[in-house]
């Protein structure tokens, strides 16, 4: 069903560790408007879509969201992979580190774990499409917020911007 290419949709090469940015960007991995929920939303809704063309489109979009999930997790990993304890202490990443060290785990920036209640699949085409449109706007707002936070680091800004626009 899928053809996985062993490369990211957009190259990511973050040179500088930044635990604070990692703690914010993780929200697009497992936060309320993140890519994990987005992929699950589309891939779940496709089964009850009465129009095969739209079901196929939901599959395509859900698959693309999985690609975004991979990009976000790569950003978090690259921002944290060489952290020292001195860099971690006193940052928002410190509490995350206690439970996950530098593993990538789905949660919001505020520490709330991912929960399937964050997305919906009602089995009604109009309701589900309305859910999708609202979810895309919430994700856009979150990416806008992240772009304001990472403006000073082009290695982070560029892949966040790419993911925001696709």
Q: Predicted regions: what is each one?
A:
Residues 2-3:
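Long, low-complexity intrinsically disordered regions enriched in Ser/Thr, Asp/Glu, Pro/Gly
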Residues 7:
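Conserved oxyanion/phosphate-binding beta-strand-loop segments in alpha/beta enzyme cores
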Residues 13-30, 93-132:
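Acidic/His metal-coordination segments adjacent to aromatic residues that form catalytic metal sites
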Residues 17-51, 67-71, 126-150:
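Alpha-helical bundle segments that constitute or directly flank the non-heme di-iron/ferroxidase center
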Residues 53-56:
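A cross-kingdom feature marking solvent-exposed beta-strand/loop segments within repeated
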Residues 60-106:
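Conserved alpha-helical segments that form or flank metal/cofactor-binding pockets of metalloenzymes
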Residues 152-159:
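Short conserved catalytic/interaction loops centered on acidic-Pro-aromatic/His motifs
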Residues 163-166:
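Conserved small/polar residues in nucleotide/adenosyl-binding loops
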């Amino acid at each position: 069903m899928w053809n996985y290419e062993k490369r990211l949709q957009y190259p990511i090469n973050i040179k500088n560790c930044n635990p604070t940015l990692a703690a914010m960007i993780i929200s697009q991995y497992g936060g309320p408007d993140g890519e994990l929920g987005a992929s699950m939303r589309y891939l779940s809704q496709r089964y009850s879509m009465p129009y095969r063309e739209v079901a196929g489109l939901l599959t395509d979009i859900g698959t693309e969201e999985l690609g975004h999930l991979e990009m976000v997790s790569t950003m978090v990993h690259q921002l944290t992979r060489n952290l020292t304890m001195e860099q971690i202490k006193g940052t928002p990443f410190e509490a995350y580190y206690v439970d996950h060290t530098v593993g990538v785990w789905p949660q919001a920036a505020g520490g709330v774990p991912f929960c399937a209640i964050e997305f919906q699949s009602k089995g009604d085409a109009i309701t589900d499409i309305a859910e999708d449109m609202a979810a895309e706007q919430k994700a856009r707002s979150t990416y806008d917020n992240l772009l304001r936070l990472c403006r000073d680091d082009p290695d982070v800004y560029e892949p966040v911007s790419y993911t925001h626009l696709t």
